[in-house]
């Protein structure tokens, strides 16, 4: 739209066009709308409802009480708005993507069907199923009545449990506000904790308000000494597990009553039903067309990097790229929401707003009225979402939850981690928005990729081969204030980012992976990425136990004692110029749980030995000496482990899925099957960690310690067995006498490292081809000789040469020619490019050149002091040549200034630093002295190190730091020796395994043999 067609009604009121509601709005309007190029904002207050300009027309953003805002009206004009609902109960087929727990009180009786009213007097749980109708893809909300929240208690003899529960409720201020219906009944259950528990009487305590569960359970435990079970299971999980439902999939409802008035949601259709009306269609794994949104924001930073609580730091633009999961990747609808006028952008719908407030209302309503289910972006959990929500709440007093998919009781928040210190594991910012599946592709990329950095540009280049056009945040104010053309350029950049993120979503197909994990773990999709793996295993264990009438106790303090974790076979550091075979235990920890039948329900703890009566040691149970004494676990024929049973069924299902995958030709179905098997793999690997997290949902550190103990024992047994094998033993493993050529009779196997679930075996005297020949047979022979199913060793990879530095740190060349690095940074990421490239040349030479490899092997097998007395092997001299050439390049000024630059972020104002004795701050102060443009907060300040004035030795880094542009412009010589020392330190860290695994020794050798010319 051209600038002349847009007018700002809040700067030039045209009151005749506006309907005045009772509400008054605050608007912050950029001054550049009145005076091009001006900074700052104008504060305007008035009753005008939010407005938008689109295609030369002025429209009202906000909708009426039915949620019919600008996006809904647009759909109505296109003929894609809300379909008609039946006026009577009829069957309904629909797909569910989210399940919510809400509470109705008796006040709702007037608006719900009469046969449902008994469920909500005085209050009751109503489960909301959000999804799409099968018939036409319309968004639906199904309100399900009849689900209960409950827990179990084992009470002392003589306690009147019902009276105790009522007493607890009377003591609660919550219950006085909302009366709660109570039911207490005796049931027969068994505790899962410990072998030999017999079925007994427990009290099942049902409460009509879920918030009462925790209070009542704590009261019974603390006041009356009751043992509490499953008080940490919410009504949503009860709904899924009690009825064998799914969290993502197709449902059928035999009698769905449409709700035409007094609706709870903004879905296109809303229905009421009871739990008993529902059934699941598991055989159908297809998806309806769900709506995915990728968004990005551009902000104005008046004083540097934008701060949400600074009124003038407006959100200038929001790009929204929409994609339907039923469409091909790339078929996107591109939308730009912008403040002020903006020239047209090809392929983009541009909506112009007079103020930020109007644009925020439009953004929230876009998510609601376009029925968005999946929201993604890049680092949106840490920046975009907090920024939008902070602006909405703190600047404009908007409640974003009220604009969501649920009319009341919705959540729209960002939960930031409060502590990143000791014991804080995998702390992530969590986005919780009712009715949305939030997926931050930044977190996904960090989890699935191994890159030097995870900027969107880097990831897009690596995965998509796409180049991201970047605009520095310091350019944003200038572009925005420049007028419609500047905003067009800014908008193109903004939309491009969102489109790239949507491409990444489709590349990883992460939405399908999330859905498959949700199904197998019995949890809603929105909890998959943010809530970790504990909740997944807990839900599965709960489901398995429930089928056998077992119940899970609440964890106690005694369950949280520490234990010794996994250990490794210490590495024999050095350079190995012979093949190194790596054998892995396939799914080590899950296979140990299966092989030894480990579980809460098969364990007999110290002091409970009477439970072993009638059982035979070794035949009926195994014993393990742990930190707290001797623990026993009964074998499968006595009682099958729930954990092992889960693993067995999952792995069998995964095997069946992989078989289907191999025969499947439909691309979409192949994607679903692949994500299903991956979801099973992830969940299997989480079982051990579930038992070993002291502050987890159901910890049992005795099980975790038993697993790690067995893992250590298995590594040690395998090491001894492998090292005892002779070439003749290996020859005998050939599938037939003539299948293999004779192996080298002088060959020898030696385990040089063992890491949790793998062994590194040096195959000294064997060729690469010989090692590859016997690798699989060796692994299979070791498995047959030492272990029971399903424990299995597999030949994973073979290195042709290997630099083994310390545990979990090595670099080597695989037999296919690829270089593999584990735990190794060639140099620190903060090192300059000069040091990085030269260190890479050194490493490549050591791993690729035959003479250098021989020399490196010799060096690693002798004391480093011999290098001073006997000199370096001739084959190692090319490494020294690289370092000497680097020094010459520095001295003669052949290294570009850009390769010598370092950079550090200016994280706060200069006055806020406790010490300014840092190189980047020294350069900042030089900018001040020279009256040059100053960097803003969050800018990275570049610097190089130059020779100190007068050639003073031992000068501090702050005295040597200089602006690269200034140094190049004025011919200031760089600090040659400083950079060369950095290079030697980087090379020494790489080569330390050649010199007694001592980086200091390696540095002294390199310093001794590099020919640093005299001054």
From Swiss-Prot:
GO biological process, one term: viral DNA genome replication
Reaction it catalyzes: DNA(n) + a 2'-deoxyribonucleoside 5'-triphosphate = DNA(n+1) + diphosphate
Subcellular location: Host nucleus
Enzyme class: transferase
Keywords: DNA replication, DNA-binding, DNA-directed DNA polymerase, Host nucleus, Nucleotidyltransferase, Transferase, Viral DNA replication
Domain of life: Viruses
CC annotations in GO: host cell nucleus
Enzyme Commission number, as recorded: 2.7.7.7
GO molecular function annotations of the record: 3'-5'-DNA exonuclease activity; DNA binding; DNA-directed DNA polymerase activity; nucleotide binding
Function: Replicates viral genomic DNA in the late phase of lytic infection, producing long concatemeric DNA. The replication complex is composed of six viral proteins: the DNA polymerase, processivity factor, primase, primase-associated factor, helicase, and ssDNA-binding protein.
Quaternary data: Forms a complex with the major DNA-binding protein BALF2, the DNA polymerase processivity factor BMRF1, and the alkaline exonuclease BGLF5. Interacts with the putative helicase-primase complex composed of BBLF4, BSLF1 and BBLF2/3 proteins; these interactions may coordinate leading and lagging strand DNA synthesis at the replication fork.
Annotated PANTHER family: DNA POLYMERASE CATALYTIC SUBUNIT, DNA POLYMERASE DELTA CATALYTIC SUBUNIT
Family, similarity comment: Belongs to the DNA polymerase type-B family.
Protein name as catalogued: DNA polymerase catalytic subunit
């Amino acid at each position: 739209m051209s600038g002349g067609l847009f007018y700002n009604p809040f700067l030039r009121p045209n009151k005749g066009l506006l309907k005045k509601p009772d509400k008054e709005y605050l608007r912050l309007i950029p001054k550049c709308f009145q005076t091009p190029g001006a900074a700052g904002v104008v504060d305007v207050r008035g009753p005008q409802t939010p407005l938008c300009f689109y295609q030369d027309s002025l429209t009202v953003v906000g909708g009426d009480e039915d949620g019919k805002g600008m996006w809904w009206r647009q759909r109505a004009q296109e003929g894609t708005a809300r379909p008609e609902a039946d006026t009577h109960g009829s069957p309904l087929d629909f797909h569910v993507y989210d399940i919510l727990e809400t509470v109705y009180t008796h006040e709702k009786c007037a608006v719900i069907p009469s046969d449902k009213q008994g469920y909500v007097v005085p209050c009751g749980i109503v489960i909301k199923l959000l999804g799409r109708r099968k018939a036409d893809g319309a968004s639906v909300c199904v309100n399900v009545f009849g689900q209960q929240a409950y827990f179990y208690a084992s009470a002392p003899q003589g306690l009147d449990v019902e009276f105790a529960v009522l007493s607890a409720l009377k003591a609660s201020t919550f219950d006085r506000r909302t009366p709660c219906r109570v039911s207490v009944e005796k049931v027969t259950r068994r505790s899962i904790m410990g072998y030999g528990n017999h079925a007994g009487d427990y009290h099942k305590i049902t409460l009509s308000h879920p918030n009462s569960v925790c209070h009542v359970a704590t009261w019974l435990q603390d006041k009356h000494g009751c043992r509490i079970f499953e008080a940490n299971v919410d009504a949503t999980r009860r709904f899924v597990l009690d009825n064998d439902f799914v969290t993502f999939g197709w449902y059928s409802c035999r009698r769905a009553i449409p709700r035409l008035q007094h609706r709870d949601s903004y879905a296109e259709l809303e229905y009421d039903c009871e739990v008993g009306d529902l059934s699941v269609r598991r055989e159908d794994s297809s998806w309806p067309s769900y709506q995915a949104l990728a968004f990005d924001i551009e902000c104005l930073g008046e004083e540097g990097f934008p701060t949400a609580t600074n009124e003038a730091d407006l959100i200038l633009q929001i790009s929204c790229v929409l994609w339907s999961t039923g469409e091909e990747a790339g078929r996107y609808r591109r939308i730009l929401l912008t403040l002020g006028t903006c020239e047209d952008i090809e392929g983009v719908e541009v909506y112009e707003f007079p103020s930020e407030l109007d644009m925020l209302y439009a953004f929230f309503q876009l998510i609601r009225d376009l029925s968005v289910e999946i929201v993604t972006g890049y680092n949106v959990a840490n920046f975009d979402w907090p920024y939008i929500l902070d602006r909405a709440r703190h600047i404009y007093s908007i409640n974003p939850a009220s604009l969501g998919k649920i009319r009341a009781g919705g959540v729209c928040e960002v939960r930031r981690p409060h502590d990143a210190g000791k014991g804080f594991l995998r702390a992530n910012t969590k986005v919780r928005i009712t009715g949305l599946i939030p997926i931050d592709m930044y977190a996904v990329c960090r989890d699935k990729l191994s890159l030097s950095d995870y900027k969107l540009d880097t990831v897009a280049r690596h995965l998509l081969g796409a180049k991201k056009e970047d605009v520095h945040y310091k350019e944003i104010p200038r572009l925005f204030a420049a007028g419609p053309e500047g905003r067009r350029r800014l908008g193109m950049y903004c939309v491009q980012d969102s489109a790239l993120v949507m491409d990444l979503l489709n590349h990883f197909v992460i939405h399908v992976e999330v859905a498959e994990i949700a199904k197998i773990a019995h949890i809603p999709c929105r909890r998959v990425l943010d809530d970790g793996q504990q909740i997944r295993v807990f839900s599965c264990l709960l489901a398995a136990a429930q089928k056998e009438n077992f119940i899970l106790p609440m964890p106690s303090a005694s369950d949280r004692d520490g234990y010794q974790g996994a250990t490794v076979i210490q590495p024999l550091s050095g350079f190995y110029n012979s093949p190194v075979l790596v054998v892995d235990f396939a799914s080590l920890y899950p296979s140990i749980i299966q092989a030894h039948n480990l579980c809460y329900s098969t364990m007999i703890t110290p002091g409970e030995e009477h439970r072993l009566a009638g059982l035979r040691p070794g035949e009926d149970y195994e014993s393990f000496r742990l930190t707290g004494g001797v623990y026993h676990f009964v074998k499968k024929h006595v009682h099958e482990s729930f954990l092992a049973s889960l693993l067995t069924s999952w792995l069998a299902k995964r095997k069946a899925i992989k078989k289907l995958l191999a025969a499947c030709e439909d691309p979409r179905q192949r994607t679903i099957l692949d994500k299903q098997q991956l979801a099973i793999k992830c969940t299997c690997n989480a079982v051990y960690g579930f038992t070993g997290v002291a502050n987890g949902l159901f910890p049992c550190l005795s099980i975790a310690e038993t697993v790690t103990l067995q893992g250590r024992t298995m590594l040690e047994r395998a090491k001894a067995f492998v090292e005892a094998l002779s070439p003749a033993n290996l020859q005998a493993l050939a599938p037939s006498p003539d299948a293999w050529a004779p192996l080298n009779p002088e060959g020898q196997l030696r385990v040089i490292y063992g890491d949790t679930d793998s062994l590194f075996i040096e195959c000294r005297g064997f060729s690469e081809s010989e090692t590859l020949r016997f690798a699989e047979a060796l692994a299979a022979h070791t498995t047959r000789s030492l272990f029971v199913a399903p424990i299995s060793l597999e030949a994973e990879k073979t290195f042709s040469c290997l630099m083994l530095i310390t545990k979990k740190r090595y670099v080597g060349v695989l037999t296919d020619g690829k270089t593999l690095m584990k735990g190794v940074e060639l140099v620190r990421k903060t090192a300059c490019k000069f040091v990085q490239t030269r260190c890479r040349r050194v490493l490549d030479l050591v791993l690729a050149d035959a003479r250098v490899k021989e020399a490196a092997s010799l060096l690693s097998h002798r004391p480093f002091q011999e290098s001073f007395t006997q000199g370096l092997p001739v084959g190692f001299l090319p490494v020294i040549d690289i370092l000497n050439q680097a020094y010459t390049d520095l001295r003669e000024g052949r290294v570009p200034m850009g390769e010598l630059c370092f950079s550090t972020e200016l994280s706060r104002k200069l006055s806020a630093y406790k010490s300014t004795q840092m190189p980047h701050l020294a350069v900042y102060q030089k900018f001040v002295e020279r009256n040059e443009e100053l960097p803003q907060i969050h800018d990275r300040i570049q610097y190089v190190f130059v020779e100190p004035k007068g050639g003073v030795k031992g000068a501090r880094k702050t005295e040597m730091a200089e602006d690269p542009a200034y140094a190049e412009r004025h011919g200031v010589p760089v600090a040659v020796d400083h950079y060369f020392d950095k290079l030697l330190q980087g090379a020494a860290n790489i080569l330390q395994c050649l010199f007694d695994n001592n980086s200091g020794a390696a540095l002294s050798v390199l310093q001794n043999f590099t020919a640093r010319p005299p001054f």
